[in-house]
Amino acid sequence: MNSQVMYHNVPTPPGNVSLAAAAPDGGLLYAGIRCINYISAPPANGEQPQVVTMSTRINILALDVSPMWGLGNGGPTKPFAIVGDDLSVQVWDCALGEAVIGHKAHQHQHEARDVRVVHHTTNSVLMSYLANGNILSMDASDLVIYCVASNTYCRRSTFISPRNHQLTMVRCSPYNDNLFAVGTAMGNVLVCDLRKMNIVYKFHGHKAPICGLAWREVPAAEDEKTNNLALSAEEWRSRNGGQEEKPKTKPPPLTKSKAAESDDPFDIYNFDHLEYEFGAPIAERRRKSSEDCGGEFVGLEKPAGAAVLDFVEACESVKAELLASRQEDKTQHVEVTLHDCEPTKPTGPLSDASTISNKNDASDSTEGSLEVIQYSSSSDDAVIVDGEAAKPKREVLHHIYHQAEVHASGTPQTKSEPQSNLQVVPAISAETISLTSVNSTHLETLLVSIDGDEVMMIWNTNTGAHAGKNYSKSKTAGKLNNVYWLNNHVIVSLSRHQLFFWSVEFERKMLRYKISKDKSHSCHLQDIVSFACDSSKEMIWLCRNNRQIGMMNPKTGRMADFYGTVAFGVRAMAECPDDMNKIALGCSDRRVAFFDISKLTTSCLPIDSVYVSSNVYCLAWSPNCLELAFGTFDGTVGILDVERMKVKTHLRTPHKKEVYSLVWQDHFIYFIVNRVLGFFDLRKSKIEPTIVNCISRPSYLSIRDSFLFVGTDDGLLQIHERDSGMEKSWSPFIRQSALFARYVTDIAWCPLDSNKFAVSGNDRSVYVMEFQPTERNWKTLHTFTANTEKASITSMRWSHTQKHLLLTFHIEGKVCLWNCNAPEKPPLTITYHCPMWCGMFLPTNENIIMCSGKALSVELIDIKDALEGDEKSICPKVDALLNVKWASKSLTQPYAPVLTAAEKKRQRRDQRKAAAKLEVDVANKDQKKIQESVTAVIDNPTNDKCTQETPVEEMLEALSLDKEQNNRSAKECPKCKEQSPDSFTHSRTCLYLTQKELNKSALEKLAIVLTEDSAKIDKSVLISKLFSSKVMAKELIATELTNLKHSNTKDIAPLCLAMSTFKLREELEQHIANKTLTERHVSLAPSVSFTLWQDCCRAYAKQMEEKGYIMHAATYLFSQGMQSEAIKLFLANEYYKEALVHARICLPATDPLIKTVINNWLEHLEGTGNFAAAALICVLDNEMLRGYSYLRKYRNCTPEIADLMDQIKRIGQLGGVLDGCAPNEPIHNGSTAEH
């Protein structure tokens, strides 16, 4: 390893959503899982490589790099923007590694309260940077423009119909502040103008969702041809410039006249006036001109009467005249721009001669410059020169000077007659003509798009024309397809996890670009997840499926740089005993990674990973260092072949819980899972776990020769010894000490002092001890205490070169370096914003600490300067979301909520209903008051007092639509609404249909009865069955019961009718099956049979249990003599007091269910943190040691708690068990105890 190479961060793997972008400085930004990674361009001149990992806490939906990267301008120096899973848009500064500003314009209230409720996709909010550095973000209904400089945003309703277009991609033009392109799920590409808020072009052609868009400005094809012609003419002039010329008289100033007729001697297509201009006859000049220009002649316009012209003298003369004219300032200048010189009928690609780019807007001509116009005839037009054959597409260059008059645009054949035919113009040398023609090229803005079917299309955004297409032969649709421009002539696309290179050439016959496979670039990788192109260097960044990030040279197809990745939350680090440079990492994303520090260079971060079945919690190297054991989250222990990088086998432990401690000694792998210690014997053909039952509640283990050190869940440190002659048997603990209030987390042995070890736990104390093997004892050397009250140490690591240095990693986000030579000195503290899990000293340089945490992959910190400067703390990374300044809404234009047509219609309908209801209520109220006043006058005619009018306040309250209307009829009882559905209601009848006949259709039924038609009477008049036989009365009850069941009546009526028909059993059995029993059903069940009543009680108890009424259910179980079932029901639903009191009364004193209730009650109190109540119950149950252990769990031991612990220790005679480390003689236990 090069000692000068040091990466501060190890990047994380790419996330599930492929988001990557190339920074303007050549670096790579890509999104990981809840983080962003930046890798700088390959360093040069011995510079340090830069890798930055930034935790976002939430998943990322969109990522884009600002065009202002590296400019600063008083804001972030390296800004980029993301869209979080909570729909917030955040602007980050890569130089600071934190979010700076942002806005939450796309958030709704319920989403802002809890992000976990709604799971957004990448199409929820689309975001891209505009060319001016502002941010455009879009969702289904709104379009938000975020001004980064002022930290304000403006939200408008989108002009893209969400009903017709489901957006999948947005890319703003890097060449225009107002243009952006969006792709839809239907395969449309929309080019939109932000200033005009409309769709400029709508491109059709794709049949699958758009997956990628890329902009590019390229020179127009006709301009390239013109530049080639100008260069050829200049070369021809340089070859003939040495010929002698005759002295020439000073010619008159150059003039610009109107276009001449075809027979005019100054016609631009008449070349006779150019005789001897370059020292050659006319015929020879025509021949050479045709040869040099490929059959297309470039002519120069000449003034009248000048057969030969000395350009040098003309330039000097005109220069003097220009100086004189500027001094006099008499000439009125007319500015001519490129826009004024546009060709009227262009050929080549379907585009303007100009572009709407802001860059071209700034390239307007200035005084004294030379502008070039390109005239091109169509394929049907032809130009005849001196009677020769027609030559199609002849291009002619005109001199356009700034004092020339601007003619109105028209066809090349149309001539406009200005008021002044002649204007004086300055003359410029031929060299200036050629240079100006090269520099004034026209640019076309092309947009390439790719869909899910790998079909690419090129669009000309200047004219809205389709400019090219390739056809895919693949039938597989992919969502990871993407496209970039590598340069002006090469496009690179991603599909099927492969890169494809396409050459782009303009075809003049088809007036389109031809897309074909490019053979000069190649890439043979087939595991690419995402990529980004650095167009300035023509290099490609690749994010691969094997969790490596690399930069590839497309010309050679080889990886120039590659970087391994590690996910957040590395839970274990273990260096190989034979090769300390090889470090194994237990990752939280089902991987085991290997970091080979010896191969670390400026262009290589060597990390290889292997996929395993679950998250890895602990690691252990085999004695021969060829295999690695790992414990996982789901209770399995795997064995990995390091050389082949493959998992050999998976061993299942007795529990499906995390394996949080692992040791490999000889042929045995020891593990702890779910407070159980066991081991695997690898010599057996069928490997099964063996449980060690003599060790209770272990939390961590360490083996030293024949001694087993065990840290328990109660904070005790125990030592066990292997029985003589037995490899699998361990004696009960020989020695134990109470060190912590809670579980032991780590036991670390010093590599330079074989008997020194440190013990840490879920507490703020660290004990450094010395083991005495001959005496089977230990003694405390030092005790380090963290200054944080609620500290908890997750792991420790000793130095390999200095035996007095110890590293501890804390759950509150600290890494402390302790010095055993100066135990009273405060440690060097490295502060982070997340819990820290593990770490170590870098084997090659112990001035560098390598650590990992919950929101940290692997970070390397150099502490050399801090140690030399005697610093107390280092803060390498702060909370990235701590100092975000959220934007406010812009007040330039008020915001009105955007409603769709359906929502507006629904709102108007609700308003009409509310208004109509209000009118009815007011009318009823007025009518009621009139009736009351009339009644009062009638009852008391002598009272002449007028009724009071309605107060104005009451009328205004009635008009308020915001207030909830409390409409209740006069006959309505408010107490009835408060009653539960099962409460008794006063009912006047159970024959509702018969009552209806009497009240509403008595006359009609009477008419039927008077017809004396018995069949019609029996069919239509129910009340007639009351005056008939018993059979007819039963039919009446059956009809009424059917009606009651259909109407779901819950009163006593169905039971009352069933009692008379002797069908109560059927009624109750039906209610049991439907789980709709009530107490009245249970009360009536004994009238049928005792067995049915028992069934009803059990069914009703089960029904109440399902509804959550545990007390009701237990009561009915007790009534059936099912005491054990009722107590278990109380216990299962955490009714511990009720369960215990009934168990004391109903069960024998020796019943194990009583002890089960007490134990479950204690575990519940421990889980809720009520240690005082747990200790009280333990003392009452005569479990003094357990009560003492509960009081020790208090982190802040007050004098009151300490006094209670002393009393429990005294009463329970626990001095021999809880003696700590003070006695010199060990205290024995079990069969080896001394009496």
From Swiss-Prot:
Modified residues (Phosphothreonine): 355, 411
Residues bearing the modification Phosphoserine: 289-290, 351, 354, 357
Composition bias, Polar residues: 352-368
Stretches for region Disordered: 227-263, 340-368, 963-983
Main localization of the protein described in the UniProt heading: nucleus
Gene inactivation effect: Late larval lethal associated with molting defects at the 3rd instar stage. RNAi-mediated knockdown is late larval to adult lethal; the phenotype is the same if knockdown is restricted to muscle tissue, neuronal tissue or motor neuron cells. Conditional RNAi-mediated knockdown in the central nervous system or muscle tissue of adults results in age-dependent decline of motor functions, including climbing ability and flight.
WD repeat boundaries on the chain: 55-102, 428-469, 475-512, 565-605, 611-650, 690-730, 739-779, 788-828
GO biological process: adult locomotory behavior; flight behavior; molting cycle, chitin-based cuticle; response to ecdysone; spliceosomal snRNP assembly
InterPro entries: Beta-prop_GEMI5_1st, Beta-prop_GEMI5_2nd, Gemin-5, TPR_GEMI5, WD40/YVTN_repeat-like_dom_sf, WD40_repeat_dom_sf, WD40_rpt
PROSITE patterns in alphabetical order: WD_REPEATS_1 (PS00678)
Complexes and interactors: Component of the core survival motor neuron (SMN) complex composed of Smn, Gem2, Gem3, rig/Gem5 and one of 3 almost identical Gem4 paralogs encoded by Glos/Gem4a, Gem4b or Gem4c. Interacts with nuclear receptors EcR, svp (seven up), usp (ultraspiracle), Hr39 and Hr3.
Protein name: Gem-associated protein 5
Native source organism of the sequence: Drosophila melanogaster
